[in-house]
A protein has these predicted regions:
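Structured C-terminal cap/extension of enzyme domains
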Residues: 205, 209-210, 231-289
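Catalytic alpha/beta core domains of metabolic enzymes, predominantly
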Residues: 122-245, 257
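Glycine-rich, proline-tolerant flexible connector loops at the mouths of alpha/beta enzymes
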Residues: 18, 43-67, 133, 190-191, ...
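Histidine-centered catalytic micro-motifs
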Residues: 8, 27-32, 42-54, 79-84
Length: 289
């Protein structure tokens, strides 16, 4: 039986500090969270960064560089996956939707990948969704995705294609067909975002069955769906992700105090089902890094 790759997404950009006092915010806190997750069984860490003074999402190269330096100083084997998600949110002005409202983060797509070009992590995310997100809209147009993918390829980084709905997978197939992205690809299904993929087994089975032959895939669930999707993904032959980007509760009403706790819970679930987690080096071989 193949081992399972566990990714830990330690902070994200939508989880807010006021939601939990345990959210990693500073570069050192984020790096320490990654190292703790690795000790608990994570083979990969998915990293966003924040402004240390406010906890708000950052796109600053120096913040990413400091986190990576702190991780590599203590753990050179851990696979680092940097986000490219920030920079795609549009908030319309009430009464004049042509005008951006506060909260809009839209920027040049090349700005969204400049840290990837500079730091060259082994993996980075590449969101393929254009969708409603609460009262806002997330926009990743095919042309912008292609511009970002070109930079990612030139940096020698593997893109992790994040899929929020079935149409995103059709875009991924087009990117492979025209040579923008190498096939069969690495995919992550994002389950439970409002107006995105549902968290029922039938949805995950359908998405898995639409993948190109030979594709590697993972899935994760948002909030209360986190641990059910751990089990569903494993049962369907996929890899898994947990972390405070996606969920801040260990159980109903009980905040997790660390990302390592979430990793440990997922590890136990996989073990109870008869599986084993892959080490970072084993994951590296499985992914062809």
């Amino acid at each position: 039986m193949n081992k399972t790759i566990l990714t830990c997404a330690v902070t994200g950009n939508l989880t807010k500090p006021e939601m939990t006092p345990y959210l990693p915010i500073t570069p050192k806190q984020i790096a320490d969270a990654c190292l703790g997750a690795a000790d608990a069984g994570a083979a990969v860490v998915h990293i966003h960064v924040r402004y240390p003074e406010t906890g708000k999402p950052s796109m600053e190269l120096d913040h990413y560089a400091e986190v990576m330096h702190l991780i590599k100083a203590q753990n050179k084997e851990l696979i680092i996956n940097l986000t490219t998600g920030p920079g795609g949110r549009y908030v319309p002005t009430e009464g004049d939707p042509k005008v951006f409202a506060p909260g809009t983060t839209l920027c040049d797509p090349l700005k969204r990948v400049e840290h990837v070009a500079a730091l060259k992590p082994e993996i980075c995310s590449l969101d393929l969704n254009t969708m409603n997100s609460g009262a806002d809209v997330v926009m990743n147009t095919p042309s912008n995705v292609r511009k970002m993918a070109k930079v990612i390829r030139e940096a020698g980084v593997m893109p992790e294609l994040e899929i929020f709905d079935s149409g995103d997978l059709n875009l991924a197939k087009d990117l492979i067909a025209d040579g923008t992205v190498d096939g069969p690809g690495l995919y992550t299904f994002v389950m439970g975002v409002k107006y995105g993929l549902n968290t029922d087994p039938a949805t995950l089975l359908y998405m898995r069955d639409q993948l190109p032959s030979g594709a590697l895939w993972a899935a994760f669930g948002i909030s209360r769906a986190e641990f059910p999707i751990v089990a569903q993904a494993w049962l369907l032959g996929g890899h898994i992700r947990v972390g405070m980007e996606d969920n801040i509760y260990l159980e109903k009403g009980v905040l997790c105090e660390s990302n390592a706790q979430l990793v440990s819970r997922a590890k136990r679930i996989i073990g109870d089902l008869g599986g084993q987690l892959a080490s970072s080096n084993e994951a590296r071989q499985m992914l062809g890094l």
